[in-house]
Amino acid sequence: MRKMTNARQSKSKGFTLIELLVVVAIIGILAAIAIPQFAAYRQRGYRSQLVADVRNAATGQEAYFVDHQTYGSSCTTLPGFTSSALTSLTCSGTASGFTVSGTNSGAPNYTCTWASANNPPLQCT
């Protein structure tokens, strides 16, 4: 009787190969679903970051105008403004208006422009 109990216990330890293959297959299916969704989330994040940087630069242009009665000729003249690491901005301004354009290297083929003369001023394509 004792030998039979020991034999059963030694056979019941661990998982079978089939059980492990089923678990690996389930993990593979979940990964196949999750990875494309993750890439889409990243794209939306990069686009949101670009919009935020363009809006912040536009706010910086308005702050510059309050102090100098003209808009800043470049983004480097804006007080206390720095864009995100992946965002590249171009600013131009005169006494009558300004334009801020930007791209984000994480979201290729997506550009946002804030032109003070436009209504609405922010346009992204």
Model feature map: region roles:
Residues 1-15:
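N-terminal leader/signal peptides at the extreme start of proteins
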Residues 37-54:
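Aliphatic-rich helix starts adjacent to a transmembrane/signal segment
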Residues 15-17, 36, 105-108:
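Glycine/proline-rich, flexible active-site/cofactor-binding loop segments
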Residues 24, 51, 58:
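Conserved catalytic core of two-component sensor histidine kinases
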Residues 32, 40-43, 59, 63-66:
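Regular, well-ordered alpha-helical segments
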Residues 15, 20, 71-72:
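N-terminal/domain-start alpha-helical segments
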Residues 55, 59-125:
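Periplasmic/extracellular, small/polar-rich flexible segments of pilin-like filament-forming proteins
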Residues 18-37:
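Alpha-helical hydrophobic helix detector
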